[in-house]
């Protein structure tokens, strides 16, 4: 469960294998 990656990254992000990857 990533939750909201956009909020965690404070920008664009993607959920991969249950983790947020930020761009």
From Swiss-Prot:
Cellular-component GO terms for this entry:
extracellular region
UniProt site positions, description: Aromatic residue of the functional dyad: 23
Tyrosine amide modification sites? 23
Q: Where does it live in the cell? A: Secreted
Residue pairs linked by disulfide bridges in the UniProt entry: 2-15, 5-20, 9-22
Annotated Gene Ontology MF terms?
potassium channel regulator activity; toxin activity
Question: Which region ranges are annotated with the description Interaction with Ca(2+)-activated K(+) channels?
Answer: 13-20
Annotated site location: Basic residue of the functional dyad: 14
**What keywords tag this UniProt record?**
Amidation, Disulfide bond, Ion channel impairing toxin, Neurotoxin, Potassium channel impairing toxin, Secreted, Toxin
Keyword check for NAD: no
Give the UniProt tissue specificity note.
Expressed by the venom gland.
The answer, when asked if Secreted is one of the entry's keywords, is yes
Q: Which domain of life is it from?
A: Eukaryota
InterPro entries, alphabetically? Scorpion_toxin-like_sf
Supply the domain comment: Has the structural arrangement of an alpha-helix connected to antiparallel beta-sheets by disulfide bonds (CS-alpha/beta).
Q: Which family does it belong to?
A: Belongs to the short scorpion toxin superfamily. Potassium channel inhibitor family. Alpha-KTx 13 subfamily.
Described by its record, this protein's role is as follows: Reversibly blocks Shaker B potassium channels, with a dissociation constant of 200 nM.
Listed name of the protein:
Potassium channel toxin alpha-KTx 13.3
Supply the source organism for this entry.
Answer: Tityus pachyurus (Colombian scorpion)
